[in-house]
Amino acid sequence: MVVDDSAVVRQVVAGLLADDPAIEVIAAVADPILAIARMKVQWPDVFVLDIEMPRMDGITFLKKIMAERPTPVVICSTLTEKGAQTSMAALSAGAVAIITKPKLGLKQFLVDASDDLISAVKAAARANVKRLQVVEKLTADAILPASDRHDAMLQTTERVVALGTSTGGTQALEVVLTALPRVTPGIVIVQHMPEKFTAEFANRLNGLCQITVREAKNNDRVVPGRALIAPGGKHMLLRRNGAQYSVEVLDGPLVNRHRPSVDVLFRSVARCAGANALGVIMTGMGDDGAAGLAEMRKAGARTLAQDEESCVVYGMPKEAVKRGGVERSVPLGAIAREIMAQMAG
């Protein structure tokens, strides 16, 4: 079901999806009130949902869906700062993917992005959204940030943790990062996410975690107690200068159809950290990160994968296991504990 107040978006999105023989569009409606009426007749397998709509906003509607009958939702949101904030709220409420749309040239953009849209809907149909319901864990930092949380951690470390994830990863990363203590090895993360969304995502996590979480900037140092998330639309590599790690943020072609790419990060970690690293590949569609994790393991790094049972989409971890890059597969709830155990000493 497509729910969007723009007649152009409804027409184009519904048409693109209907052209795929594996997808049936049961309805395309202008707002959530009309959607609710249609849902009484037939409940869809997947919703494609706008955020800003008349009579009921998309976030409120999403929460109603998840409370009544959890169903995969793909957000189709305008690429603005406000759109990024509301889309992050949607991911927190249980949406499984975001497709961004521009203010201008919308019809042509949707046609050009049809492959991404169709892939997102198909991946959403396979997602188990019941696993997306994560209880928000707040810390005192959400109300009053500790003034010394950065300064005490600015010594360097030879140990580094690299995390890679995609569909379902925003909720999975929240589970992992909020469970880590303040004294934690430096962390570098690739989460497949559009441009402008990663800063809002990092800011939200920073308010929930004992560690510092922020969107990476070029030449940021990787230090204990800090997690750096690759910016949407940019690749991120780990670099080493003597005893210090830092990140390089750069443009470049899509790798495995992604930018940032998990493979790019993992390969750089394998080359400059070797046995001092831990690689973790988590929920996500496709195979990005599978080759890079195998390179990390070959270089002496410890490697983990999120297990099938706890994944929203068991794609990236499955491919990493197939390619021999995974030492152990563990449940989502055990990953933080494994990070601390394997990086101790």
UniProtKB/Swiss-Prot annotation:
CDD domains: CheB_Rec, REC_CheB-like. Residues 154-345 form the CheB-type methylesterase domain. Residues 1-116 form the Response regulatory domain. SUPFAM superfamilies: CheY-like, Methylesterase CheB, C-terminal domain. It is found in: Cytoplasm. Gene3D superfamilies: 3.40.50.2300, Methylesterase CheB, C-terminal domain. It is an enzyme of class 3 (hydrolase). Phosphorylated by CheA. Phosphorylation of the N-terminal regulatory domain activates the methylesterase activity. It catalyses: [protein]-L-glutamate 5-O-methyl ester + H2O = L-glutamyl-[protein] + methanol + H(+); L-glutaminyl-[protein] + H2O = L-glutamyl-[protein] + NH4(+). The modification 4-aspartylphosphate is found at residue 50. The active site is at residues 166, 192, 288. GO terms for biological process: chemotaxis. Its EC number is 3.1.1.61, 3.5.1.44. Involved in chemotaxis. Part of a chemotaxis signal transduction system that modulates chemotaxis in response to various stimuli. Catalyzes the demethylation of specific methylglutamate residues introduced into the chemoreceptors (methyl-accepting chemotaxis proteins or MCP) by CheR. Also mediates the irreversible deamidation of specific glutamine residues to glutamic acid. This is Protein-glutamate methylesterase/protein-glutamine glutaminase 2. It comes from Albidiferax ferrireducens (strain ATCC BAA-621 / DSM 15236 / T118).
